[in-house]
C-alpha cells in the first residue's frame, strides 16, 4: 500500500470521529448551554449557616433573657427596666431595618454578618459591665440599655440572613430546611432564655450571671462570623435562581409593594411574628396574676419552642418535597390561632397548668411551623427581588406590630381585682410597688380579635404565584433540552463524508 493509501486511511479515521457541525454557531451554542447548566453546592454552606444560626440564637437570648426574671431585673436595674430592655429591640429594628436591607443587598451577606456579629458581641460585653459591683446604682440601667441598644442594632442585619443564605448557598431541595434551621435558632434562643434565666436569677444580685451567660456565646458567634464567613456567595451558584441577577434595592421595594399577594403576606406574617414576640415579652405578666410562677412561665415558653422546632422541621421537609407552601401555611396558621386563643383564655384562670402546657405545645408546633414557610413564600412571590428585601420587610413588619401588640397588652390591662390579690405571685413582697399584677381580660379580647382577623385574611385572600419555582422549572427544562441536543450532535457521524471515501482494495 502506497503513501496515498495511508492518507486515505488516516482521513477515514478522522471522518469517523468528526461530529456533525453545520455552522460555526453550533459549537458556541453548545458551550453556552454547558455554562448555563453549571451548578454546584459547597460544604462551606453549612459553616455559613452555622454562623447565621448562632448569631440569631445568641442575639435572641440577649433580647428575651431579662423577661422571664422581670421582677428581679426590675429590682436590680429599676422599675419597668425588663420591659424596656426587650422593647429596645423592637424600637431599634424599625429605624435601622431599612438601612440593613439596603446594606445587605448592596454590600453583600458577609458584610451583614460581620456587622451583626460585632454589634452583638460588643453589646454583650457592655451589659456585663453594667452589672459589676463598682457601677453606681443610678448608672446601671443607662449602661445596660446602651449595650442592649448596640446588640439590638445587630438584629435588623440578622433578620433576613436565613433566607439569603438558603437562596445563595443551598440547592432548591434544601432551601426550606436551611431557612428553617436559620430562623428556628431564634425561638431556640427564646427557649434557652426562658429555661435558664429563671434558673440562674433567684435574686436581684444574680443578674450579673445572666449577663455573663449571654455574653460568652455571643463572643463565640462573633468569632465564627469573622473567620468562618469569607465570602457572600459561592463561586458557582447552587440553583438557576441563584445565578439570576437580582433587582436593586429601590426596584425591589417597588416590586414588593406593587404585589397584592406580598402585601397580604407582609401584614399576616408580620402580625404572626409580632404576636409571638409580644407573648414572649409579657408571658410572665399574663400568668403571674393567676398564680403561675416564674418557672411555669418559662416552661410554657419552652414548650412553645420545643413544639415549634419539630413543627418547623417537619413543615420544611414537607414543603421541600411537595412545594405545597400555600396549603401548609393556611392550615398551620389557622390551627395555631385556635390553640393560641384557648391558651390566652386559660391564662385568666388558676389551676389549669396541664391544659396550658398542652395548648402551648400545640400552639408552638403549628405557629412556628409557619415562620420558615412564610419567609420562603415571600421570596417566591417577589422573585427576582433580593431575599434581603422581601424577607426583611416581613420581619420589619413583625417588629412594628410587636410594639403595637405590647402596647395593647400593657395599656388595656386594668388593676387586678382585690379578691384575686391572694392568688397573684407577681409581687416579690407584700409592699412591692414595682411588680403590680394586672387583669388582662380586655387586652386578651383585643389580641384575640386581631389574631382571628389576620388568619381570615390569609385564608380568604392569599393566592400566591410561585415565581421562583416557575423560573427554575423553565430554566431547567431549557437547559436539559440544550444538553440533550448537544449530546446528540456530538454522537452524530458525518455519514455523507464517510461514504465519499473509497474502500481500500487489496493488491
From Swiss-Prot:
Keywords: Membrane, Transmembrane, Transmembrane helix. SUPFAM superfamilies: MFS general substrate transporter (SSF103473). It is a multi-pass membrane protein. InterPro entries: FLVCR1-2_SLC49-like, MFS, MFS_trans_sf. The keyword Transmembrane helix applies. It is found in: Membrane. GO terms for molecular function: transmembrane transporter activity. It holds the Pfam family MFS_1. CDD domains: MFS_MFSD7. The chain crosses the membrane at residues 46-66, 83-103, 112-132, 141-161, 181-201, 207-227, 263-283, 299-319, 328-348, 354-374, 389-409, 442-462. Residues 477-493 have a biased composition (Basic and acidic residues). Residues 477-507 are annotated as: Disordered. GO terms for cellular component: membrane. PANTHER family: MAJOR FACILITATOR SUPERFAMILY PROTEIN-RELATED, SOLUTE CARRIER FAMILY 49 MEMBER A3. This is Uncharacterized protein B0416.5.
